[in-house]
Amino acid sequence: MTTTASTPEKSQQSPGDGATPAVHVEGLWKIFGPRADKIIGTEQAQLSRKELQEQTGHVVGIRDVSFDVAPGEVFVVMGLSGSGKSTLVRLLTRLIEPTSGTVELYGEKITGMDDSALLDTRRRKVSMVFQHFGLLPHRKVVDNVAFGLEVRGEGKGQRRNRAQEMVDLVGLSGYENNYPDQLSGGMQQRVGLARALAADPEVLMFDEPFSALDPLIRRDMQNEVIRLHEEVGKTMVFITHDLAEALKLGDRILIMRDGEIVQIGTPDEVVGAPADEYVRDFTSEVPKSHVLTLKWVMRPDTGDLRADAPTLQHDQIVRDAARIVLDSEGPCRVVDGDRVVGVVDDEDILRVVVAEEGH
């Protein structure tokens, strides 16, 4: 595959203009064991997960993790079982207590809060959606959705109105008086989404919410998350073991292994420039033309473009640009805004497509 004249930089920190991150994580550790706090900062902390467990009986869940999530971003954390991804999302709200490190939500230090402030933050600023729906079987849909508002102390009329709005938002109008056991798995997860949204949180966190659903229902729920994000614009942290799900949902993806960050990047960065063999294996089956943008396949502009050459943006997906490029009589101009950054022709496009077919 032809690369650009200037290989795109990896997005190790959040995009943006210096605004306060929605989520800021710095130097986060979680070690399970009775002397966990004594290990941080010692030579033992440099041992591999296996070596540390063999020598001390302690297990590293998360090792020195740092990242930012921008306001409004869908940030996906993925990895295989045991990679630490579910531990990480629980550390963000201190459902599991960190051994060391800092977590902030919109500038507020979660790791420094007392129990009262932490409880208030969980009630008002963060909502979580888990794989297991956790619906109350004796409550109707609308009352399940309103439950968090009830715990928060809001009046019955106010919380019922808000709950009905969220029921309608997630496409369950007409089911508000049904009980959970009268709903399909996908519908129950929609109730979970509505309940999470009802509190109007600043950050939504998802821990593999769709992994137990049938493939078609899972796809529908992924599309529902995309639609809801477009409508409400919430910051989302999404945990998954499924690369296809990560590529579909994520603005950026953090890949974990053995409690450590392996790579952070946009979907096209992860597929186009995998950090190591672990990531390369993850992405080997991905149809690259569906993920890579033109900046990954374009060549330097040599100055011989036709005046009427088609113009394409550098962040356009190869698959979406293919018809225009293949129908053009010569190379197409690739721009970043108004600046020409390269050219692309049919050979560049076909090189990606042929590589997929020969995989």
Q: Model-predicted segments: where are they?
A:
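Conserved ABC ATPase signature
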Residues: 179-183, 187
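The conserved cystathionine-beta-synthase
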Residues: 307-330, 334-339, 344-359
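ABC ATPase "signature
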Residues: 264-265, 273, 343
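Conserved ABC ATPase "signature" region
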Residues: 24, 41-51, 108-109, 150, ...
